[in-house]
Amino acid sequence: MGNAAAAKKGSEQESVKEFLAKAKEDFLKKWESPAQNTAHLDQFERIKTLGTGSFGRVMLVKHKETGNHYAMKILDKQKVVKLKQIEHTLNEKRILQAVNFPFLVKLEFSFKDNSNLYMVMEYVPGGEMFSHLRRIGRFSEPHARFYAAQIVLTFEYLHSLDLIYRDLKPENLLIDQQGYIQVTDFGFAKRVKGRTWTLCGTPEYLAPEIILSKGYNKAVDWWALGVLIYEMAAGYPPFFADQPIQIYEKIVSGKVRFPSHFSSDLKDLLRNLLQVDLTKRFGNLKNGVNDIKNHKWFATTDWIAIYQRKVEAPFIPKFKGPGDTSNFDDYEEEEIRVSINEKCGKEFSEF
């Protein structure tokens, strides 16, 4: 690297530092005094279910006054308690209302009633990366790199706030109208200084240290980034099997095989991210995220232009106008039932 290039890189890293320091101030204000009860169920017209989970569903809704569309996440308090997800759910809302980044889905309103918790988020009509990846088969390396760069920046932002995301997978990445990523589902996100021990995540994406019940840190997100980049570029994840236990055996073995079409730069990056030895894993070394940002596979990436959303996206989802749900699957519709008695008031008092 020439002197001029080195100087440019140095000044870029300085301005990132300044940006993150300011971002932390903004985050901490909202983290310390979270917004509560900023809307009511009656203000929204419910249109269609976009997805379902073990303790709730996500619906497309329309704000009756403004006509704006949103994605409303509805969580059944009693089911959340039964599945021991109280802490995770409170984390999700507290974190989402405090963060602000171009590739994180925005929480617009949150409220609760006798039966449910509600998180009303920006509606991202392009659907999940998962469905586009399965349809296309695999992404070209430049296509995968465009998405990967956004995740790198997002993790750099989250980690600077002491947040671990813990749930990276194509199902949690939505594609917006400009073809950029919106990370959704902060159900497993957590603010941690140092290490944590909870077993959570998706089998294919779990880092070895989580499987081995060791204390772990934000390096688990960089491992998951390696899994995601592999899956985007190959069309299948690096470790897969019929049963979770078999997947776990492959993950902790430290062996990974690459398709012959992977470039040597991509293989090199992945060996450094899918690195079982934490003292060698990229993102977890003394240079932090810069080992990843300065890697040869990302040589063509203009990080500032990605952040500013100035890079032309490789793929724009089909979009037929506001409220279009054609990029989402169909689900059986169900009435939202609200009890006349308050359920689990104590458990969710801070929501």
Swiss-Prot record:
Which ranges of the sequence are coiled-coil? none
Which UniProt keyword terms apply here?
ATP-binding, cAMP, Cell membrane, Cell projection, Cilium, Cushing syndrome, Cytoplasm, Cytoplasmic vesicle, Disease variant, Flagellum, Kinase, Lipoprotein, Membrane, Mitochondrion, Myristate, Nucleotide-binding, Nucleus, Phosphoprotein, Serine/threonine-protein kinase, Transferase
Q: Which residues make up the binding site for ATP?
A: 50-58, 73, 122-128, 169-172
Post-translational note: Autophosphorylated. Phosphorylation is enhanced by vitamin K(2). Phosphorylated on threonine and serine residues. Phosphorylation on Thr-198 is required for full activity. Phosphorylated at Tyr-331 by activated receptor tyrosine kinases EGFR and PDGFR; this increases catalytic efficiency.
A GO MF label: ATP binding
Q: Which residues carry this modification: Phosphoserine?
A: 11, 140, 339
**Catalytic activity, EC:** 2.7.11.11
Quote the annotated effect of residue 137 to R.
In CAFD1; decreased interaction with regulatory subunit PRKAR2B
- Activity regulation, free text: Allosterically activated by various compounds, including ATP. Activated by cAMP; the nucleotide acts as a dynamic and allosteric activator by coupling the two lobes of apo PKA, enhancing the enzyme dynamics synchronously and priming it for catalysis.
The subcellular localization recorded is: Cytoplasm; Cell membrane; Membrane; Nucleus
- Keyword Nucleus set for record: yes
Per its record, how is this protein called by name? cAMP-dependent protein kinase catalytic subunit alpha
Q: Which organism is it from?
A: Homo sapiens (Human)
